[in-house]
Design a protein with these regions (language model features):
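Short amphipathic helix-loop junctions that connect adjacent transmembrane helices
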Residues: 33-78, 279-296
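Conserved MFS/SLC helix-loop-helix module at the cytosolic interface between two early adjacent transmembrane helices
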Residues: 93-132
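Juxtamembrane intracellular "pre-TM" segments in multi-pass secondary transporters
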Residues: 2-8, 231-269, 287-288
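Transmembrane alpha-helices of Major Facilitator/SLC transporters
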Residues: 296-316
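Cytoplasmic helix-loop-helix junction between adjacent transmembrane helices
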Residues: 137-176
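C-terminal membrane-cytosol helix-exit motif in multi-pass small-molecule transporters
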Residues: 216-236
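Glycine-rich segments within core transmembrane alpha-helices of 12-TM secondary carriers
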Residues: 169-192
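Pair of pore-lining "gating" transmembrane helices in MFS-fold secondary transporters
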Residues: 9-59, 257-277
Length: 316
């Protein structure tokens, strides 16, 4: 390998590592806040006479299969938390392949900048999400712009050979683990730092605006880091030129290799299960063990350290 190629490879590894790390930090900041966040909006809507969360709760309570005391919202809150998390995941499911295909056509760098810019706008909305629908809108924007992870991973594949690609992907796993440690920690500690007095206005600060501000700051740092340091990894002669990008997920049935198709399906079901665990774990900790945000932080610290150990030693 030429010295210039080796330099590009090292630079790409560094930029992608920090990009994935910061992306996981801002993504996981809200994990320890989810139960408190939904309870806050329920209380707010109780004061102002209803809203999106209350309507959803009433809809859930209309089913006889839900046996819950009339004065308790806990079960319904957990369901809504899962729905909010699923909203982001479903949008990521559809849009990440689109961003990935687009990056095959125009390059990794511009797509990373587009997706990170959308992520910044989503967290900017979250700062002023006095009403729950604004929070939902910010999550929609974040889900649509959530292609940076797949594109950053593709950049690793661009600069590695088949023989050493597992080492590059292990680096991705370590960045995941580190982000999973710092993100929930920042989210848990930010809960005790309030930007301003909380009001019931539609666009206003909430007890979680400080976490949103931290997320926005890190997302902007991530955007600037890619803008300044990331060099394009996909050569022009390797870029596609066939019309509009198509979501690869809809081409799954056309995969001729049966083993590859089964592997893709298995990974799909695994990620659905894992994502469900991610977004319901905090509710389990609060409901079953009465965890505080600080104790949830400690739980995610342990999970993150385990991820780092597994990815750094076993995957590598």
């Amino acid at each position: 390998m030429k010295a210039s190629d080796q330099k590009v490879k090292r630079s790409t590894f560094g930029v992608v590592f920090l990009t994935i790390f910061l992306d996981m930090v801002v993504f996981s900041v809200l994990f320890p806040l989810f139960p408190e966040m939904l309870d806050h909006y329920l209380a707010r809507e109780d004061r102002i006479g209803g809203g999106l969360v209350t309507d959803f709760v009433d809809f859930i309570l209309s089913f006889s299969i839900v046996g819950q005391d009339a004065g308790s919202f806990r079960f319904e809150t957990v369901i809504f938390g899962g729905a909010l998390g699923s909203l982001y995941a479903v949008l990521q499911f559809f849009f990440a392949p689109i961003w990935g295909r687009l990056s095959d056509k125009i390059g990794r760098r511009p797509v990373l900048l587009y997706t990170l810019g959308g992520t910044c706008l989503g967290y900017l909305l979250w700062i002023f999400a006095g009403d729950f629908w604004i929070l939902v809108l910010s999550r929609i924007l974040g889900g649509v712009a959530s292609g940076n992870l797949s594109v950053a991973t593709a950049a690793i594949a661009d600069v590695t050979s088949r023989e050493n690609r597992s080492r590059g992907m292990a680096l991705v796993g370590i960045a995941f683990g580190l982000g999973f440690i710092l993100g929930p920690a920042l989210g848990g500690f930010s809960f005790y730092w309030q930007l301003s007095s909380v009001s019931d206005g539609i666009f206003s600060f909430t007890p979680f605006s400080s976490a949103a501000l931290i997320s926005l700051s890190l997302a902007v740092l991530n955007l600037l880091w890619v803008w300044v340091r990331f060099r394009e990894t996909l050569a022009e002669d390797k870029r596609g030129s066939d019309g509009k990008p198509k979501p690869a997920i809809f081409q799954l049935g056309r995969i001729e290799n049966d083993a590859v198709r089964k592997t893709c399906l298995a990974y799909l079901f695994y990620m659905i299960s894992f994502s469900g665990m991610e977004f319901t774990l905090t509710f389990l900790a609060v409901e079953r063990f009465s965890y505080s945000p600080r104790e949830i932080v400690n739980m995610f610290l342990l999970i993150g350290l385990t991820l780092i150990f597994a990815q750094g030693f076993f995957v590598r």
